[in-house]
Regions:
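Helical element adjacent to the flavin cofactor pocket in flavoenzyme catalytic cores
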Residues: 158-215
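Short beta-strand to alpha-helix junction loop
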Residues: 78-88, 112-121, 159-177, 187, ...
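C-terminal catalytic lobe of FAD-dependent flavoproteins
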Residues: 270, 279-280, 291, 295-408
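Dinucleotide-binding Rossmann-like beta1-alpha1 core, especially the glycine-rich loop
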Residues: 68-144, 148, 154, 270-273
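Glycine-rich FAD pyrophosphate-binding loop
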Residues: 43-65
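Flavin-dependent oxidoreductases
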Residues: 37, 195-286, 291-299, 310, ...
Length: 414
């Protein structure tokens, strides 16, 4: 019988009673939601799989510093890979969340025009969403806004009923857990330090030894350009883009049960400071948007805290009466540059021309969380087009939900 392994947090060692092999069919570099989605997707096939993550835990980068929104796909430009994988990923994320027991909720979402002059922009967003295949979009008036979100101030809004919220790190862990249960190996605290190209694949150097692999899938997020450079691929430059957040106390969930966004600028560079309820009852304010030189610069500032509050209170004045308990920042991997020379950049998913059987996923920013399962399917297609891979009859798709201490009764906590 296929053995299942259930983890409530990521692992820093291989989960197996056997010694770790040194040869694999596919090595995934990066243990965020995209890397773990790729690992889980490839575990459906008869492949020996390894994931390398440089941090002590999974989901330590982009995957923990975001809004946790399941996007419906109307905010991304039509005809792009972002749009295609977002809309395709929408149903995939909900399906995976059910199969893997991941907390999530289909909340709907409102993009709110405080001023009537912003209605044309809502019409543009709806038309873009219709082209992209986003389901159920509708422009609603003040009375409908009050019915959906009584505490939101606005004249008009674009309603997206299929938008939702999910715990991004729990989703990442669940994908990894499913892959582990289907035979994949994961090494956390194991950065990739060297790459040697060989006729039959690659030799990957790490502090824990070297691993031979026929394929490499680069899902390293902010470091994807540097990981590619280790293999001599100098095609990419990633810029770090910091977004600061504020977290309102759990009582704030009483006044907002649906994500609320302002009308975004026409260049689609930024969605604006939005308000997002969490599955735990808190409300997130943010993110802000600023390029930073250091890819690890996740600092928060008082000036931005004040700005986040001011913009949030314009949409939901009732939030003024709740305390804010924490601030944090997340970083996004931008392919557009701070100088504005590159105006628009799409997701990149491609096999390297220089290094056969090396697949790069670069610039996977928002809506990367929603797009992750679709991006993973693309990787499987790239590998499947080059060699014969067969689905495993013993693949275990489902995972029981992991019990949470906070959800138990007194006896269960004792």
């Amino acid at each position: 019988m296929h053995q299942r392994h259930t983890v409530s947090r990521p692992v820093s060692r291989p989960i197996s009673n056997e010694a770790l092999p040194t040869a694999f069919d596919v090595a995934v570099v990066g243990g965020g939601v995209v890397g773990c989605a790729v690992l889980r997707e490839l575990s459906r096939y008869g492949l020996k799989l390894l994931l390398l993550e440089k941090e002590p835990d999974l989901a330590e980068g982009i995957s923990k510093g975001n809004s946790g929104v399941i996007h419906a796909g109307f905010n991304v430009p039509s005809g792009t890979l972002k749009a295609k994988t977002n809309v395709d990923g929408l149903s995939r994320v909900y399906k995976l969340a059910r199969e893997l027991g991941v907390p999530h909720r289909k909340t709907g979402k409102l993009v709110v025009a405080v001023d009537a002059s912003d209605r044309p922009r809502l019409e543009e967003l709806k038309a873009q969403g219709d082209r992209n295949g986003t389901p159920g979009l509708e422009i609603v008036d003040e009375s409908a806004i009050r019915a959906l979100a009584p505490n939101v101030r606005g004249r008009w809004a674009l309603s997206s009923p299929h938008t939702g919220i999910i715990s991004p790190y729990e989703f990442t862990f669940a994908l990894a857990d499913c892959a582990l249960g289907n035979g994949a190996r994961i090494l956390c605290g194991t950065p990739l330090t060297s790459v040697e190209a060989r006729p039959d694949g690659y030799l990957l150097g790490t502090p824990r030894g070297s691993f031979a692999t026929r394929w490499v899938v680069n899902c390293a997020g902010l470091d994807a350009d540097e990981v590619a450079a280790l293999a001599g691929i100098a095609d990419y430059k990633i810029y770090a883009y910091r977004g600061e957040y504020l977290i309102a106390d759990r009582e704030a969930g009483e006044v907002l049960g649906i994500p609320v966004y302002p009308v975004p600028p026409r260049d689609d560079s930024f969605l604006g400071v939005h308000l997002t309820p969490t599955l735990h009852g808190n409300v997130l304010l943010g993110p802000s948007s600023a390029y930073v030189e250091d890819k690890r610069d996740a600092a928060t500032t008082r000036a931005m805290t004040d700005r986040l509050k001011a913009e949030a209170f314009e949409l939901v004045p009732a939030l003024r009466r709740f305390p804010f308990i924490h601030a944090y920042a997340g970083l996004r991997p931008k392919l557009t540059d701070p100088q504005g020379k590159i105006k628009l950049a799409d997701f990149i998913v491609e096999e390297s021309r220089l290094r056969p059987r090396w697949v790069n996923l670069v610039g996977i920013e928002s809506p990367g969380l929603t797009a992750a399962p679709s991006l993973a399917a693309m990787v499987a297609d790239i590998i499947g087009a080059r060699e014969d891979i067969a689905l495993r009859p013993d693949f275990v798709a489902e995972r029981p939900a992991v019990p949470k201490f906070a959800d138990g009764d007194d006896a269960g906590r004792a």
